[in-house]
């Protein structure tokens, strides 16, 4: 019985360590080790992009887009198991941190940039 209990406890510990834990006060600049989580579920947040000279490069991948209204300042926070994105003007997204859902209200504004052809999609 003790072996089963310890096995279950070990599995739970493995799951918890791969999730965001603890409280995160509202911030526009989450730590580097949390960027993958926050930028996966709402990539239009300004902290997900490095923008210079009219082009923005995604910090997690090789995607380059034209700098426009797609990239928005975002405030993210976490309390218990609730993760929240706040885009201002009453636009926010709250999700269970351990069961995240992709959400991007500005998806239609995304304009990818191609090096060979500066035309956008």
Curated annotation (Swiss-Prot):
UniProt keyword Lyase present: no
The keyword Glycoprotein is annotated on this UniProt entry: yes
Signal peptide residues on this chain, from the entry's feature table: 1-28
Induction: Expressed in the early phase of the viral replicative cycle.
Keywords, ordered alphabetically: Early protein, Glycoprotein, Signal
Glycan-modified residues: 62, 116
Function (record text): Plays a role in virus cell tropism, and may be required for efficient virus replication in macrophages.
Similarity comment: family membership: Belongs to the asfivirus MGF 110 family.
Name of this chain's protein: Protein MGF 110-5L
Species annotation: African swine fever virus (isolate Warthog/Namibia/Wart80/1980)
